[in-house]
A protein has these predicted regions:
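N-terminal intrinsically disordered, cationic/polar leader segments
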Residues: 1-307
Length: 307
């Protein structure tokens, strides 16, 4: 039967990749997915050859700084197209990488694991790549906090406090709400060389507060208070990720791509909440400039298929 396939390949291939950052090497575990497009004349692909081709591509590419996982994805995609005689290849890589952090008050050194993400697509004539990160934080719910504020104001009024004093008290005292651990993901599709830790900062700062593996009591107090002074909806985090990315990288071209995604894990519900935004830089800039709805939200798959 002569019928082309949209994709055929392998998923979940585990490889150890040596990466350099800050003058030291780190051996990290990477998970690789790879697919190729098949034209009607091709019966199939050599599935068993994919891991071998990954090894060849990794050996050929000297990985420099930590975020170059996207360059590796692009190199593998090109290698697969050439060696498998495919029309097109798409590669996705996810690697867990340790970064050093200092806690906000005591300065305690702590190691946090973040996900470095690389996506690339290659045809016989061109290629595109995205660099991404995934990081966790905490979001304090603004809605519940508003309810607590209203009730606190009512009780203070019943206790005889003047309105001006009530407002002052509510400004000074952190207000309770329910918290959500959040996972933010940010992808940028560009030829620019970006620093992955800068992307992690953008993701973490879009939430109410970063979180840390180790915390002394003064640090714990700071994180909790800071989060409750910066309540965020899941939608707020996505909008902040997009805006911060465009502000930080003004040299992005209009045809470059941004995708931001936030998942908050609920504590008082049995469901979780999600928001995301994707599109070309030009689409996002235009919408932020005029405040009107953009009729086009270019999706990741469409952006990758432009090659």
């Amino acid at each position: 039967m002569q019928l082309g396939l949209s994709r055929a390949g392998v998923t979940g291939v585990q490889k150890a990749v040596r990466m350099q950052h800050g003058g030291s090497d780190a051996l990290v575990s990477a998970e690789i997915d790879c697919f190729v497009d098949l034209d009607p004349a091709q019966k199939g692909v050599h599935m068993s050859r994919f891991p071998e081709l990954f090894e060849e591509a990794i050996d050929e590419l000297v990985i420099g700084e930590m975020l170059l996982v996207e360059r590796l994805a692009e190199h593998i995609a090109r290698h697969i197209v050439a060696r498998q005689d495919a029309l097109r290849a798409e590669v996705r890589i996810a690697a867990r990488y340790p970064i050093e952090r200092s806690t906000p008050v005591t300065g305690l050194r702590t190691q946090e694991l973040v996900s470095l993400l690389g996506i690339a697509a290659a045809s016989r004539t061109a290629s595109r790549r995205l660099v991404g990160v995934e990081a966790t934080g905490i979001n304090a719910c603004p809605c519940a906090q508003g309810l607590v504020r209203d009730q606190a104001a009512e009780r203070l009024g019943e206790a005889g406090f003047a309105d001006v004093d009530i407002e002052r008290i509510l400004e000074l005292v952190p207000l309770a709400t329910h918290n959500q651990r959040g996972r933010g993901t940010l992808y940028l599709g560009t030829e620019l060389r970006l620093d992955a830790e800068d992307l992690v900062d953008i993701v973490e700062q879009s939430m109410s507060s970063p979180i840390y593996e180790l915390l002394k009591r003064p640090d714990e107090l700071f994180v909790v208070e800071h989060a409750h002074l910066s309540p965020r909806f899941v939608e707020d985090s996505v909008r902040l990720m997009v805006k911060s990315s465009l502000d930080a990288y003004g040299e992005l071209r209009d045809e470059d791509f941004v995708m931001a995604r936030q998942v908050n894990f609920e504590t008082i519900h049995n469901h979780d909440v999600l928001a995301e935004r994707f599109g070309t830089v030009g689409e996002l800039r235009a919408e932020l400039a005029n405040g009107g709805h953009s009729p086009t939200h270019t999706e990741l798959g469409d952006w990758l298929r432009a090659v």
